Amino acid sequence: MNIHYTTQFKKDYKRIKKQNKNIDRLKVVIEKLVAGKKLEPKYRDHRLSGNWNDHRDCHIEPDWILIYRIEDEELILERSGSHSELFKK
């Protein structure tokens, strides 16, 4: 499976690195998704609704999430960050 990083995800990734988050935790999740493995329950992987209804959300840490979707054997990484950063109204 190929990986596509959206422009917004790239910006999120830079912000996460500046926050000194453990990037290895994110890499582990991405590797599992690319391999087609089901994520363990601790990641709380689930479908989103509303404007994000064709996306999934999993928790890297309790308040650090990854929003992604899989289309035609391609993993598309959309966003990553805290709930307040990603879902602010």
Report each predicted region and the residues it spans.
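Basic, amphipathic "hinge/linker" alpha-helix immediately C-terminal to the N-terminal HTH DNA-binding motif
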Residues: Y5-F9
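Enriched for short, Lys/Arg-rich terminal
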Residues: N2, K14, K21-D24, V28, ...
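Residues at secondary-structure transition points
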Residues: N20-K21, Y43, H55, G81
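A short, surface-exposed loop/turn module that caps and links secondary-structure elements
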Residues: K32-H59
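Alpha-helix C-capping/helix-to-loop hinge sites
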Residues: D12-I16, H55
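Nucleotide phosphate-binding site architecture
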Residues: K10, S49, F87
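Secondary-structure boundary motif
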Residues: R15-K18, A35
